[in-house]
Structure formats: structure tokens, C-alpha cells
């Protein structure tokens, strides 16, 4: 079965317009809508990139059927994996089960803003693997403690 999606162009449109656009996409019959999770737009001329998680939360409340998803959220540098799990779990409740979390290792354009440098590719992949392990454990329920190579989590629960 073919599913047709709509991209919320966060680098080209403000947050209020993005929510109006996803409502229109739902009315037009699109099956899902995705958004990038960028701090900066790809090009300086594009203005600013709204915070994807606030836009998704507003879209979840403004729609009833359309699925919502992040293209790639990087749970390793700009966000801690436990915080990503909390954001995703909250959005899943707001969207009444319509949210899907897309994860990846990110890119320097958006992840450098919190400092700490830009790790080598093999390190970013290690970090992503560990982050996915933490997020999965939190989604599974119960208390989670994790003391790994890149991340620590102490008695966290969703």
C-alpha cells in the first residue's frame, strides 16, 4: 500500500504557518507529515528554523488523523537521549499514537551549537547506538540507569 507524506518545510515557513499547512495536508488526504529537527536552516537566506518539537506538539493538537514524524532527531549532541525519549513519549500522547521518531547521527550545521566539538564519524555512530539503547530501554518502561561510554542516565522513567 502506498502512503503519501507531506514535509513541513521548517527552514522556509514559520511555526504558525507550518501548523496551518499540516492541517491542510490532513484535509487533502495526506497519510503522514514529517519535519526536520534543525537548529539552523540549510541556507542563511532561509531565515530561521522553528523548534520542531513545539511545531509537532501544536500539529498534534490541530489534527486528528495524519501521522507525524521527525525526519532525523540527533539524540547524541544537542539533545541527551533521555530527553529525546521524554519528548517522543509526550508527543506520542499528544498525537494519540500517531507519532514516529526518526533518529540519526546528525550533522555539524545543527549539532555544534551546544559546544563540545564535532566527533568523528565512528564516534557519532557509537554515540547513536548507545542513545538508541537508552531510548529503547526508557520506552520499554520501568526505571532506567545507564552508565556507558558516552551517556549516563540515573533512575530515569517515562
Please state what every model-predicted region is.
Residues 1-63, 67-71:
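N-terminal beta1-alpha1-beta2 module of alpha/beta enzyme domains
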Residues 3, 60-64, 68-72, 93-102, ...:
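Amphipathic repeat-derived elements
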Residues 10-12, 39-40, 74-76, 105-109, ...:
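Active-site-proximal loop/turn and secondary-structure-junction residues that shape catalytic pockets
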Residues 12, 46, 78, 118-122:
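Charge-dense, low-complexity intrinsically disordered segments
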Amino acid at each position: 500500500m502506498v502512503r503519501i507524506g507531506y514535509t513541513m518545510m521548517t527552514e522556509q515557513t514559520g511555526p504558525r504557518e507550518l501548523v496551518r499547512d499540516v492541517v491542510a495536508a490532513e484535509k487533502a488526504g495526506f497519510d503522514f507529515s514529517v519535519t526536520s529537527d534543525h537548529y539552523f536552516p540549510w541556507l542563511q537566506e532561509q531565515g530561521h528554523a522553528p523548534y520542531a518539537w513545539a511545531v509537532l506538539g501544536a500539529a498534534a493538537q490541530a489534527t486528528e488523523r495524519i501521522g507525524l514524524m521527525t525526519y532525523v532527531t540527533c539524540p547524541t549532541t544537542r539533545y541527551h537521549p533521555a530527553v529525546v525519549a521524554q519528548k517522543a513519549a509526550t508527543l506520542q500522547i499528544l498525537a494519540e499514537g500517531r507519532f514516529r521518531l526518526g533518529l540519526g547521527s546528525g550533522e555539524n550545521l545543527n549539532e555544534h551549537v551546544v559546544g563540545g566539538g564535532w566527533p568523528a564519524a565512528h564516534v557519532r555512530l557509537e554515540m547513536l547506538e548507545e542513545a538508541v539503547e537508552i531510548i529503547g530501554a526508557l520506552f520499554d518502561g520501568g526505571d532506567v540507569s545507564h552508565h556507558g561510554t558516552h551517556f549516563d542516565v540515573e533512575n530515569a522513567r517515562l
